[in-house]
């Protein structure tokens, strides 16, 4: 009945179903007297057949200024040419099939054309209404299909109440399936909802909330819907599967739709704790960062992740960000806010329970998060845009008391120093400032003592602690258990002095080598002069100057020796170690060779 272009068709070229009908009583030789335009399609029809069923077309013809209306434009009819063809068939008495896919469009078209029972008994609107009630909305699957078909029929489908009826039916039947599943798998209905637009899906979720469905059932539906809708957005945790699109390119419309989708999903999340896996929340946050959603959306996700941060993995925290030219970076600010919110929550919980957060009373959750943070630092340590201040800012978010051992943090620091070999001594000290050398295990201290990348004071801390432990006679098994002696914590001021001594010794060693070379050059010059008397006097003078220089150096080194006469007195350890025998150290010199 429809053709493309502007050439109307004759009645003898109408569909075969029209020719087969037994209700067609007029001769097909009767010429058509009106052309109905629907978009680019033209329908050659008879006025009297259309007016008999459609009050809208009757009004158009009656109210027209032209005495003989030959063309009618119905481009605004819901459903377009395909649905109008079925409405025309109904006017001609031609049989056609009403299905769950087309019933909403047919009902909207019938209301648009005013093909109601008020105008004519047993009209098209009444037929579609009966089909909706008795067939389409009698099952969950049928109601979802009808609701899906309403997406292209807005706003008339909502104005006519079809959307509301479908949402109510879907919400009620989904709640019933969630509580009393009749099919396997039990969550089959969540898969059915995935075909809906996010706005209709939101309406269904709201309907289920009003009916008191369990939050866990809502969470299951939201997770399934999100995974289906955003499966191609972020394919892995690192963001390498993401194709960045500039807001000005051809994909901007799709990007905008995805942004709205993420923001709508986040607004639907129930507030109950523990409903959503942390990796799901982190995946949503990656999408939100990539799509540049609103600050409210990202803050909501960060808040939810911080509540369950003890269950997060390092991969979950690797949140990619992108520059305007598509370069992939890491969103360190989001991670910092998440960790900070978790620590603040733990602090408030500790104070509420009567604990003292500032004196080292940390929960198991906080200790677990500390290990995750250290592993995260080790993972991002090789990134070139990671500065010392950013590294320390993340490391210092976790209280030092939350780390029973600083081995993981030491590993992260070592990776950072290896990835940034051009740091000077002061910068390396800043990197290591977040670590406590006295909380390293025996193996870590052994590695640190031989690590040339570490600053001198860190190496000295490790060596001094081992010496103190050796003097106190503590067994090696206790060393590996990372038992920190209270006496070792009292020697921090002495360690600072040792660091200064070590640096001065290095300067003296350099000065000594210069003087040796100077004396050697003088001897060569005097031997080449040839005058024995002056040569002898020069040698005597040289010997005296050598003797005087080495004497002064030896005296100065003797003053700087931290172990001379047992200056590092550890006798006070006896008071707290319960009678542990500590032998007095032997006299020894501070070697400068």
From Swiss-Prot:
Q: In which tissues is it expressed?
A: Expressed in hypocotyls, guard cells and mesophyll cells.
Which residues are reported to carry the modification Phosphotyrosine?
Answer: 410
Indicate yes or no for the key word Phosphoprotein. yes
The annotated subunit structure for this chain is:
Interacts with RPT3 and PHOT1.
Alphabetical list of PANTHER family matching this protein:
OS12G0117600 PROTEIN
Xref: InterPro entries:
BTB/POZ_dom, NPH3/RPT2-like, NPH3_dom, SKP1/BTB/POZ_sf
Q: Which residues form the NPH3 domain?
A: 187-469
- Pfam families linked to this entry: BTB, NPH3
Keyword Phosphoprotein tagged: yes
Q: Which GO terms describe its cellular component?
A: cytoplasm; nucleus; peroxisome
Q: What the record says about its domains?
A: The BTB/POZ domain mediates the interaction with some component of ubiquitin ligase complexes.
What protein name applies here? Root phototropism protein 2
Q: Where is the BTB domain?
A: 32-100
Q: What induces it?
A: Light fluence rate-dependent induction, independent of light quality. Up-regulated by blue light treatment.
Which GO biological process annotations does it have? Answer: chloroplast accumulation movement; phototropism; protein ubiquitination; signal transduction
Q: What does this protein do?
A: May act as a substrate-specific adapter of an E3 ubiquitin-protein ligase complex (CUL3-RBX1-BTB) which mediates the ubiquitination and subsequent proteasomal degradation of target proteins. Signal transducer of the phototropic response and photo-induced movements. Necessary for root phototropism. Involved in hypocotyl phototropism under high rate but not under low rate light. Regulates stomata opening. Seems to be not involved in chloroplast accumulation and translocation.
């Amino acid at each position: 009945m429809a053709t493309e272009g502007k050439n109307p068709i004759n009645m003898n070229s109408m569909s075969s179903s029209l020719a087969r009908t037994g209700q067609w009583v007029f001769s097909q030789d009767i010429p058509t007297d009106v052309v109905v335009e629907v978009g680019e399609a033209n329908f050659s029809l008879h006025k009297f057949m259309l007016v008999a069923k459609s009050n809208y077309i009757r009004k158009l013809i009656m109210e027209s200024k032209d005495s003989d209306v030959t063309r009618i434009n119905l481009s605004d009819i819901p459903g377009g040419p395909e649905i109008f063809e079925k409405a025309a068939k109904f006017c001609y008495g031609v049989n056609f099939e009403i299905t769950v896919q087309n019933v909403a469009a047919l009902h909207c078209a019938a209301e648009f054309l005013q093909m109601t029972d008020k105008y004519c008994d047993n009209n098209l609107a009444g037929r579609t209404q009966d089909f909706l009630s008795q067939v389409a909305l009698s099952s969950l699957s049928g109601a979802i299909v009808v609701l899906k078909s309403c997406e292209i029929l807005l706003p008339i489908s909502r104005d006519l109440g079809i959307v509301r009826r479908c949402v109510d039916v879907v919400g009620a039947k989904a709640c019933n399936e969630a509580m009393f599943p009749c099919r396997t798998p039990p969550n089959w209905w969540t898969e059915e909802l995935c075909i809906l637009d996010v706005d209709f899906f939101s309406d269904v979720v709201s309907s289920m909330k009003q009916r008191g469905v369990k939050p866990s059932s809502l969470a299951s539906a939201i997770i399934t819907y999100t995974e289906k809708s955003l499966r191609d957005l972020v394919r892995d945790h690192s963001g390498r599967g993401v194709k960045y699109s500039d807001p000005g390119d051809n994909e901007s419309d799709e990007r905008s739709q995805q942004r709205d989708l993420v923001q709508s999903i986040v607004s639907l999340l129930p507030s109950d704790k523990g409903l959503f896996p942390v990796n799901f929340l982190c995946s949503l946050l990656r999408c939100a960062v990539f799509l540049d959603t609103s600050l409210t959306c990202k803050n909501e996700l960060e808040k939810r992740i911080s509540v369950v941060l003890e269950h997060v993995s390092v991969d979950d925290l690797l949140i990619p960000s992108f520059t305007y030219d598509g370069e992939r970076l890491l969103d360190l600010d989001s991670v910092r806010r998440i960790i900070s919110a978790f620590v603040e929550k733990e602090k408030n919980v500790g104070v509420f329970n009567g604990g003292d957060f500032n004196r080292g009373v940390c929960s198991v959750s906080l200790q677990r998060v500390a290990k995750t943070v250290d592993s995260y630092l080790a993972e991002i340590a090789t990134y070139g845009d990671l500065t010392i201040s950013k590294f320390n800012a993340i490391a210092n978010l976790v209280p030092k008391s939350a780390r029973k051992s600083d081995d993981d943090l030491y590993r992260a620091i070592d990776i950072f120093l290896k990835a940034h070999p051009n740091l000077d001594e002061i910068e390396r000290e800043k990197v290591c400032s977040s670590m406590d050398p006295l909380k390293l295990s025996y193996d870590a201290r052994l590695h640190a003592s031989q690590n040339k990348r570490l600053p001198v004071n860190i190496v000295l801390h490790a060596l001094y602690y081992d010496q103190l432990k050796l003097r106190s006679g503590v067994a090696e098994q206790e060393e590996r258990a990372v038992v920190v002696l209270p006496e070792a914590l009292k020697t921090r001021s002495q360690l600072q002095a040792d660091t200064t001594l070590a640096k001065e010794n290095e300067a003296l060693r350099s000065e000594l080598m210069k003087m040796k070379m100077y004396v050697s050059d003088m001897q060569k010059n005097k031997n080449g002069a040839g005058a024995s008397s002056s040569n002898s006097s020069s040698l005597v003078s040289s010997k005296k100057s050598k003797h005087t220089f080495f004497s002064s150096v030896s005296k100065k080194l003797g003053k700087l020796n931290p172990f001379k006469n047992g200056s590092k007195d550890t006798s006070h350890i006896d008071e707290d170690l319960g009678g542990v025998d500590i032998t007095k150290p032997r006299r020894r010199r501070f070697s400068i060779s």
